[in-house]
């Protein structure tokens, strides 16, 4: 798939912008704070209906405007799909093929993107929350069912935590409702964990040969979804549910004492190992960057495997963060397969072959010129 055109209205520092993308590779050049990252973010928001930079949608709306609008035409094997996302202070509304989607979970998936920005290099050494968000965003692109299950889990988790607080402060003494909420939470949690386990195994399958190639065959990358559950069969929801039930029974008194849910997918993590050693703890900066790069490149093949189309790759000021060898490996891997957008302050660091086939855009103070 690829984006044929993009229109922005009142989006961040863009009053209005219209762009045509005819090339597989599109390079956006400009000084810092001119709007390069805002453009990349707009493509990502059109795809995911949320920003990778902020959870406050109001920041996406241009100063003194009531709404922002992003429109794009996505070309796929079976035809073109117009997309539109309107962001207002009341919320977001998305259209696919001119049809308004009732839920944003139904909107997500029409356009698949992979964002690789400097902060993604923290995927390995950052907090578990960063890695959980990575899993949720990437699985959500290829599974609307997962987004529904995750949303349901988060809703029940919030209700359960509220009830635990009431039990803790003795505003409630009847525990019957806690058991009901626990059963509901377990059902949603089992589905979330099963999908995360499946995704982690798929990601490892695609990331291993990429990591081996970058490390010249000297390193083997393995991934482990870290949960306190005893998961012998990740596809058996009843076994996962039983394991949760057992754990919640043991933790009930402690949870009431603390007033919070102590167990579940919201506490899980993904661990990365190179040659059997935890990369986060023992890996060099180079190994951590190679791991992050391998995971991002693996997503390309994973999404292609799931939906039969290659996603769009957004490289936001990340090439300058990679050494020449990793940069060359990245560009060689995607060449000819994936529509790619690259932001940079200078083309000096981009190889000649990539520039030769690229469409070039210059951005200055929210204005784009091809």
Curated annotation (Swiss-Prot):
Among HAMAP family, the record links this protein to: RecF (MF_00365)
Alphabetical keyword list? ATP-binding, Cytoplasm, DNA damage, DNA repair, DNA replication, DNA-binding, Nucleotide-binding, SOS response
One biological process term from GO is: double-strand break repair
Task: Name the family.
Answer: Belongs to the RecF family.
For this UniProt entry, the molecular function terms from Gene Ontology, in alphabetical order, are: ATP binding; single-stranded DNA binding
Q: What is this protein called?
A: DNA replication and repair protein RecF
The root-end lineage is:
Bacteria, Bacillati, Bacillota, Bacilli, Bacillales
Q: What is its main location?
A: cytoplasm
Protein purpose: The RecF protein is involved in DNA metabolism; it is required for DNA replication and normal SOS inducibility. RecF binds preferentially to single-stranded, linear DNA. It also seems to bind ATP.
| PANTHER family cross-referenced by the UniProt entry | DNA REPLICATION AND REPAIR PROTEIN RECF (PTHR32182:SF0)
- What gene name is listed for this protein? recF
Where does this one sit in the cell? Answer: Cytoplasm
